[in-house]
From Swiss-Prot:
Keywords: Autoinducer synthesis, Iron, Lyase, Metal-binding, Quorum sensing. Homodimer. Belongs to the LuxS family. It is an enzyme of class 4 (lyase). Its EC number is 4.4.1.21. It catalyses: S-(5-deoxy-D-ribos-5-yl)-L-homocysteine = (S)-4,5-dihydroxypentane-2,3-dione + L-homocysteine. It comes from the Bacteria. The gene is luxS. The keyword Magnesium does not apply. This is S-ribosylhomocysteine lyase. It comes from Enterococcus faecalis (strain ATCC 700802 / V583). Fe cation binds at H53, H57, C120. GO terms for molecular function: iron ion binding; S-ribosylhomocysteine lyase activity.
Length: 152
């Protein structure tokens, strides 16, 4: 059976919120990194789908304004955070700083991008109010640079 990195992570010992380099892949000169942007404590809480979906849209646009080389930002199936796939090498500090900036933008935003039936496959399932509330929760707790101990 194939090994899946996220299934090997001990979800009982991590301490969210945090940013974690979850994997790298090298092919010739091309380097791809996968980051775990964990917002909520696994097996304790989960983002409601409206908040998760809205945060996905806001992160998709605003993180690309902060960082170069983003390939994709996708919600985790467990609804506790997001995976971000990027070209080239970055530091967790760089990712955290960008995420803090973006979550502050989320708190102050009034418009969710790409919420029409043409642009979004589930355009009715959004909650800007909830996205803002969860952004505040994450910022209030602080985003750690380590998944197992709080390094703020």
């Amino acid at each position: 059976m194939a090994r899946v990195e996220s299934f090997e992570l001990d979800h009982n010992t991590v301490k969210a919120p945090y940013v974690r380099l979850a994997g790298t892949e090298q092919n010739g000169d091309a380097l791809v990194e996968k980051y775990d942007l964990r917002f909520l404590q696994p097996n304790k809480d989960a983002l409601p789908t409206g908040a998760l979906h809205t945060l996905e849209h806001l992160l998709a646009v605003n993180m690309r304004d902060e960082l170069k080389g983003i390939i994709d930002i996708s919600p985790m199936g467990c609804r506790t955070g997001f995976y971000m796939i990027m070209w080239d090498q970055h530091s967790p500090q760089e990712i955290r700083d960008a995420l803090v900036n973006v979550l502050n933008k989320v708190i102050n935003t009034e418009v969710v991008p790409a919420v029409s039936a043409k642009e979004c496959g589930n355009y009715k399932d959004h909650s800007l109010f909830a996205a803002k509330e969860y952004a505040k929760i994450v910022l209030d707790q602080g985003i750690s640079l380590d998944p197992f101990e709080r390094i703020l």
